[in-house]
């Protein structure tokens, strides 16, 4: 039996995920720049939606890259 993953944001009592907190957002992005799914990270549906929105805003404002590198 595997241990059930716990939502880090619920434990910390976070009200909203801030798009300016780039260091926290980087933990939920793969090396290729994709958003890690909640079944892997264990985040609840509420915070996964906020996380996706925050990552997309940070990408739009060039705080985070859309992808890791470009191939020719």
Curated annotation (Swiss-Prot):
Superkingdom in the source lineage: Bacteria
Coiled coil: none
SUPFAM superfamilies membership: Ribosomal protein S18 (SSF46911)
GO molecular function terms listed in the Swiss-Prot or TrEMBL record: small ribosomal subunit rRNA binding; structural constituent of ribosome
One BP annotation, GO: translation
Record's keyword terms, sorted: Ribonucleoprotein, Ribosomal protein, RNA-binding, rRNA-binding
Role noted for this protein: Binds as a heterodimer with protein bS6 to the central domain of the 16S rRNA, where it helps stabilize the platform of the 30S subunit.
Quaternary structure (record): Part of the 30S ribosomal subunit. Forms a tight heterodimer with protein bS6.
NCBIfam families the record matches: S18
Record protein name field: Small ribosomal subunit protein bS18
The organism of origin for this protein: Francisella tularensis subsp. tularensis (strain SCHU S4 / Schu 4)
């Amino acid at each position: 039996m595997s241990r059930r993953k716990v939502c880090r944001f619920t434990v910390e009592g976070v009200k909203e995920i801030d798009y300016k907190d780039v260091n926290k957002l980087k933990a939920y992005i793969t090396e290729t720049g994709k958003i890690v799914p909640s079944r892997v990270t264990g985040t609840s549906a509420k915070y996964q939606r906020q996380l996706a929105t925050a990552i997309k805003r940070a990408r739009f404002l060039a705080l985070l890259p859309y992808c890791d590198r470009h191939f020719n």
